[in-house]
UniProtKB/Swiss-Prot annotation:
Domain Peptidase S8: from-to ranges: 110-617
Catalytic residue list: D147, H215, S550
Molecular function via GO: serine-type endopeptidase activity
Glycosites: N197, N230, N471, N776
Keyword Hydrolase attributed: yes
PANTHER family for this protein: PROPROTEIN CONVERTASE SUBTILISIN/KEXIN
EC number: 3.4.21.-
Protein name: Subtilisin-like protease SBT5.1
Length: 780
C-alpha cells in the first residue's frame, strides 16, 4: 500500500511539474491566486499533506507561496498564471482557486446613547453602573481586529489597571522591520499584533502592525478602548470616551494598506487569529457577494465560528440600494449603521437678524471671524456661461465663475446622483468662497467634509426660506455660526442612506442585516501626530470623527465581547441571538425607527433593530443555530456532500445533503429571524424554530411559561403552533412552528412583521419577511 502511494505521488509530481513548465513557455496572464482546500485536518495529516505537496511543487517550479493556511483551514496563496490556476483547481483536495481580490474598508457619545436605549427597555438593569458591569467580567476576553493596523500610543490602548495577559493567548507582537523596530510595543491591553504583505503591495514602510490610515485605530477604540476623560474633537463632542468592552484585550491583524485589503492577507489573518486564541473577530470591510467559496470573509469566518469564535462584520456602505449587503453568510453577525442623538449644530444667521436663524449642521473649525456676515449667493447665479445649469446649481467642478464665488457664502443644491459633498465644498473653497450651505435632506455624515472650511447642511424647506431671503434683498448677507455639539434633542436612531440594504443578493431565504448600531459621526481615537488629519492651522487631533458601517461593526463587537466574558460557554450563535432578540425598533421619542428620508425602516434596513447594551445580557430565550444548521445551509444553497465534507471536519457520521432540497429550505435553519422567499399565496409555508431557556437563576424564573404574540401586515396570515411554551428548567429546549398563508393570490410587496415570545419579564422578538420574489429576482 505504501509503495503504491509513493508511486502515485511521484507520478503526480512529475505530471504537475511538466505542466507547470509548459505553462511557463505559453503566453498566459498571471496574478495572485488563493487556493482553498477546506478544513485543516484534525490530526495534521492527510489534508495538510495535499497543501504541502502542492506548495512544494510550486517552489520547485520557482513559485513561492505568499501565505500558507494551516491552523483554521487549509490552503495557500501564490502568484500563478491562469493555466497554472486552472491546473491546480483540478487537483484532489482543492475546493476553489480564485483571484486574490482587494477588499475595501467600510469607512463617546454612541455608547452613552446605547445605555439610554437599554434603560428604556431593560428596567432590570437600570440600577447597574456601566463601568461596574464592564469590569466584572471582561479582562480575559480578546477581540481580534482584521484592519489597517493600530497606533499603540493612542490613549485608548493604555494598560492601566489591566491584569496579566490571559494564559489562553498564544499570539505574538510583531514589531516590524522598519529602521526603529522597537518603536512598536504591545502591553497588557494591546496584547498582540501582526502584519501581512502580499506580492501586490511590498513596501518597507508597511512591514509593521502600525496604522497609517487611522481606520484600525478608530474601530479598535470603539470596541475595546479604555475609558478616557475629556475626549473631544477640538472641543466638540467632549466628554468621557469609552469602548464597548473597555476591559477586553486587543489583538490587531494588519491586513490592509493604502490600496485596500488583500483577500490572501485576510485569510492569513483569520488563520492566525484562530490559532492565537481570540474570542471575537471584528471586520469592517467587505467584498461584493458572488460565490461563497471565493469570498475570503465567508471562508475565514466559517472556520472561526466552527471553533467558537464570534465574527462580527459591517454590512457595507452601498445603500440605500436594495440587495447591497456585504458579509451576509449566516454564521456572521452583519451590522448596519444607525444615528445617535448627538448633533453638530452650525446655524445660519440671515441678514444679521436673529429672528432669521436657519438651523443647520456641520463641523466647522475654520480660522475666520465666525461672527462676520458675508455676501450670500445661490450657485445658480455664479454659473459659467458654458456650464450646465443643473450641474452649476449642484456646485459641480468647473461649473462656477471664480470672480463671482470669491469672498461669498454659496448655497449649493444636492439633487444629482453621484455627487459627493466634499467635491462641492472643495470646489467652492478652490474658487475662493468663504463657505458653503448645502441643501440636502439625506446627508448625515460630516466626516468627509474639510472642517477648516465653513460648511453647513440644511433641509430643503429651509433652502426655500433662504432663497426667498436672497430674492427679497439687493445685498443678501449671512453668517455661519460656530459649531456646537448638542445631545438629546435629535430624533434617533435612524438609518443613514449609505448603510447597505437587504435582501441578500445570493439568497432571499436568510434575512440580512442582523442588527443596527451607531455609525454616523462617531468620536474615537486616532493616530498620534497625524498632520494630514489636522484642519488648517490646528494641531493634529488625538481623536477623530468618522462615519460608516465600519464604525457600527465594532459597537457590536464590543457587546459580543461583554457577552462572551459573562457567559464563556455561549456559542457565537447564542451571542448573536441575544443581541438580535433584545433589539429595539423605536426611537428616543417612542416613534418607529425611520430611514434618513423619513420612511419607516424595515428589517432590510436594520435587521432586528437597534442594538442595546444590557438587554443581550439577559435575553430569556436564545436561538441556537448549530453546526448542523450551517452544514444544511451549504447543502440547501447547492454544495454537494463531498464539498461540504471538505469544508468542515466536524461532519456527523452518515451525513448527506437533504434530498430534493433547494435554497428556499434555508428558511428552516434555526436563525433568530425568518425570511420566506418565492411565496405564491396559493399554499401555506411552514418553518420551525427551537429556543433554549437561558433565564437567570438569580431571578428564579427557571420554570416559566412564554406566550406568543404576532405582528403581521394586512393580507398575510401567520399562525404559531403551539402558542405557549412551558420551560421547566434552564437549558430546556422547545420547538414551535410558524405557518404563513395569504388572503390574496400574490403579495404585491414584501411583507414585514415579527413574532414575540413573552413571559412577563422577557420579550424575545424575531422579525420576519415574506416575499413572492425568488433568488433569480434581482433588484439591482
Amino acid at each position: 500500500m505504501m509503495r503504491c502511494l509513493t508511486i502515485t505521488i511521484m507520478f503526480f509530481m512529475f505530471f504537475f511539474l511538466s505542466v507547470i513548465q509548459k505553462c511557463k513557455s505559453e503566453t498566459s496572464k498571471s496574478g495572485d491566486y488563493i487556493i482553498y482546500m477546506g478544513a485543516a485536518s484534525s490530526d495534521g495529516s492527510t489534508d495538510n499533506d495535499h497543501v504541502e505537496l502542492l506548495s512544494s511543487l510550486l517552489q520547485r517550479s520557482g513559485k513561492t507561496p505568499m501565505h500558507r493556511y494551516k491552523h483554521g483551514f487549509s490552503g495557500f496563496a501564490a502568484h500563478l498564471s491562469e493555466d497554472e490556476a486552472h491546473l491546480i483547481a483540478k487537483q484532489p483536495g482543492v475546493l476553489s482557486v480564485f483571484p486574490d481580490q482587494m477588499l475595501q474598508l467600510h469607512t463617546t457619545r454612541s455608547w452613552d446613547f446605547l445605555v439610554q436605549e437599554s434603560y428604556q427597555r431593560d428596567t432590570y438593569f437600570t440600577e447597574m453602573n456601566y463601568e461596574q458591569e464592564s469590569e466584572m467580567h471582561e479582562g480575559d476576553t480578546i477581540i481580534g481586529f482584521l484592519d489597517s493596523g493600530i497606533w499603540p500610543e493612542a490613549q485608548s490602548f493604555n494598560d492601566r489597571h489591566m491584569g496579566p495577559v490571559p494564559e489562553k493567548w498564544k499570539g505574538t507582537c510583531m514589531r516590524g522591520k522598519k529602521t526603529q523596530p522597537d518603536s512598536f510595543r504591545c502591553n497588557r491591553k494591546l496584547i498582540g499584533a501582526r502584519y501581512y504583505n502580499s506580492s501586490f503591495f511590498l513596501d518597507p514602510d508597511y512591514e509593521t502592525p502600525r496604522d497609517f490610515l487611522g481606520h484600525g485605530t478608530h474601530v479598535a477604540s470603539i470596541a475595546a478602548g479604555q475609558i478616557i476623560a475629556n475626549a473631544s474633537y477640538y472641543g466638540l463632542a467632549s466628554g468621557i470616551m469609552r469602548g464597548g468592552s473597555p476591559s477586553s484585550r486587543i489583538a490587531m491583524y494588519r491586513a490592509c494598506s493604502l490600496l485596500g485589503c488583500r483577500g490572501s492577507s485576510i485569510l492569513a489573518a483569520f488563520d492566525d487569529a484562530i490559532a492565537d486564541g481570540v474570542d471575537v473577530i471584528s471586520i469592517s470591510m467587505g467584498l461584493w457577494p458572488d460565490n461563497l467559496l471565493e469570498d475570503p470573509l465567508s471562508i475565514g469566518s466559517f472556520h472561526a465560528v466552527e471553533r467558537g469564535i464570534t465574527v462580527v462584520c459591517s454590512v457595507g456602505n452601498s445603500g440605500p440600494s436594495s440587495q447591497s449587503v456585504f458579509n451576509a453568510a449566516p454564521w456572521m453577525i452583519t451590522v448596519a449603521a444607525s444615528t445617535i442623538d448627538r448633533g453638530f449644530e452650525s446655524n445660519i444667521l440671515l441678514g444679521g437678524d436673529e429672528n432669521r436663524l436657519i438651523e443647520g449642521f456641520g463641523i466647522n473649525i475654520a480660522n475666520i471671524d465666525k461672527t462676520q456676515a458675508y455676501p450670500l449667493i445661490h450657485a445658480r447665479s455664479a454659473k459659467k456661461i458654458d456650464a450646465n445649469e443643473e450641474a452649476a446649481r449642484n456646485c459641480a467642478p468647473d461649473t462656477l465663475d471664480q470672480t463671482i464665488v470669491k469672498g461669498k457664502i454659496v448655497v449649493c443644491d444636492s439633487d444629482l446622483d453621484n455627487q459627493v459633498i466634499q467635491w462641492k465644498s472643495d470646489e467652492v473653497k478652490r474658487l475662493g468662497g468663504i463657505g458653503m450651505v448645502l441643501v440636502d435632506d439625506e446627508s448625515m455624515d460630516l466626516s468627509f467634509i474639510d472642517p477648516s472650511f465653513l460648511v453647513t447642511i440644511i433641509k430643503p424647506e429651509d433652502g426655500i426660506q433662504i432663497m426667498s431671503y436672497i430674492n427679497s434683498t439687493r445685498e443678501p448677507i449671512a453668517t455661519i455660526m460656530p459649531t456646537r455639539s448638542r445631545t438629546g434633542h435629535m430624533l434617533a436612531p435612524s438609518i443613514p442612506s449609505f448603510s447597505s440594504r437587504g435582501p441578500y443578493l445570493l439568497t432571499r431565504s436568510i434575512l440580512k442585516p442582523d442588527i443596527a448600531a451607531p455609525g454616523v459621526n462617531i468620536l474615537a481615537s486616532w493616530l498620534v501626530g497625524d498632520r494630514n488629519a489636522a484642519p488648517e492651522g490646528k494641531p493634529p487631533p488625538l481623536f477623530n470623527i468618522e462615519s460608516g458601517t465600519s464604525m457600527s461593526c465594532p459597537h457590536v463587537s464590543g457587546i459580543a465581547a461583554r457577552l462572551k466574558s459573562r457567559y464563556p460557554s455561549w456559542s457565537p450563535a447564542a451571542i448573536r441571538s441575544a443581541i438580535m432578540t433584545t433589539a429595539v425598533q423605536m426611537t428616543n421619542t417612542g416613534s418607529h425607527i425611520t430611514t434618513e428620508t423619513g420612511e419607516k425602516a424595515t428589517p432590510y434596513d436594520f435587521g432586528a433593530g437597534q442594538v442595546t447594551i444590557f438587554g443581550p445580557s439577559s435575553p430569556g430565550l436564545i436561538y441556537e443555530t448549530n453546526h448542523m444548521d450551517y452544514l444544511n445551509f451549504l447543502g440547501y444553497y447547492g454544495f454537494t456532500s463531498d464539498q461540504i465534507k471538505k469544508i468542515s471536519n466536524r461532519i456527523p457520521q452518515g451525513f448527506a445533503c437533504p434530498e430534493q432540497s433547494n435554497r428556499g429550505d434555508i428558511s428552516n435553519i434555526n436563525y433568530p429571524s425568518i425570511s420566506i422567499s418565492n411565496f405564491n399565496g396559493k399554499e401555506s409555508r411552514r418553518v420551525s424554530r427551537t429556543v433554549t431557556n437561558v433565564a437567570s437563576r438569580l431571578i428564579g424564573d427557571e420554570d416559566t411559561v412564554y406566550t406568543v404574540s404576532i405582528d403581521a401586515p394586512e393580507g398575510l396570515l401567520v399562525r404559531v403552533i403551539p402558542r405557549r411554551l412551558h420551560f421547566r428548567k434552564i437549558g430546556d429546549k422547545l420547538s414551535y412552528q410558524v405557518i404563513f398563508s395569504s388572503t390574496t393570490t400574490i403579495l404585491k410587496d414584501d411583507a414585514f412583521g415579527s413574532i414575540t415570545w413573552s413571559n412577563g419579564m422577557y420579550n424575545v422578538r424575531s422579525p420576519f419577511v415574506v416575499t413572492s420574489k425568488d433568488d433569480n429576482d434581482s433588484e439591482r
